[in-house]
């Protein structure tokens, strides 16, 4: 198993509007929203060298900053089994199909506590029905 690419970076924002304005200056464009506009998916528009960021409005008490880094893999289910076999990694939950994103995902934490997600696009996803 190996990481194929960085799929996206998820950021929890103190002020979603300010963060959206900031990333737009770097050529990021909204692909859509979910959660009543409290989550915005950004894309650089380059399919050959894609950059994707998910911005989430922080809720009271939430820590702001990077929530997780998501890496694309061939198969998150097989990758999770392989890593469990090797030992030493605890997973936050078993792989599952996220209906909104159309991705199969699995989450674990690295030794420093960073949430690391493995994912694979498996369906269209309902978040394409932008709010």
Q: Where would I find each of the regions flagged by the language model?
A:
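N-terminal beta-strand motif that seeds the catalytic metal site of vicinal oxygen chelate
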Residues: 1-17, 66-69, 119-131
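Short amphipathic alpha-helices in soluble, non-transmembrane regions
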Residues: 22-26, 82-87
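Short polar/acidic secondary-structure junctions
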Residues: 45-47, 60-61, 97-98
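Conserved beta-strand in the GNAT
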Residues: 53-56, 116-117
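Vicinal oxygen chelate
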Residues: 6-14, 33, 43, 60-131, ...
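A contiguous binding-surface segment within folded domains or other stable secondary-structure elements
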Residues: 48-54, 64-68
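Core segments of cupin and vicinal oxygen chelate
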Residues: 3, 10-51
């Amino acid at each position: 198993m190996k990481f194929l690419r960085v799929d996206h970076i998820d950021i929890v924002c103190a002020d979603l509007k300010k963060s959206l304005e900031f990333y737009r200056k770097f050529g990021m464009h909204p692909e859509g929203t979910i959660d009543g506009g409290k989550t915005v998916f950004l894309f650089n528009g380059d399919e050959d060298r894609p950059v994707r960021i998910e911005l989430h409005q922080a809720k009271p008490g939430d820590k702001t900053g990077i929530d997780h880094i998501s890496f694309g893999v061939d198969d998150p289910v097989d990758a999770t089994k392989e890593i469990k076999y090797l030992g030493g990694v605890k997973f936050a939950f078993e792989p599952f199909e996220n209906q909104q994103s159309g991705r199969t995902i699995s989450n674990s934490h690295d030794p420093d506590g960073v949430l690391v997600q493995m994912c694979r696009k498996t369906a269209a996803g309902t978040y394409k029905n932008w709010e």
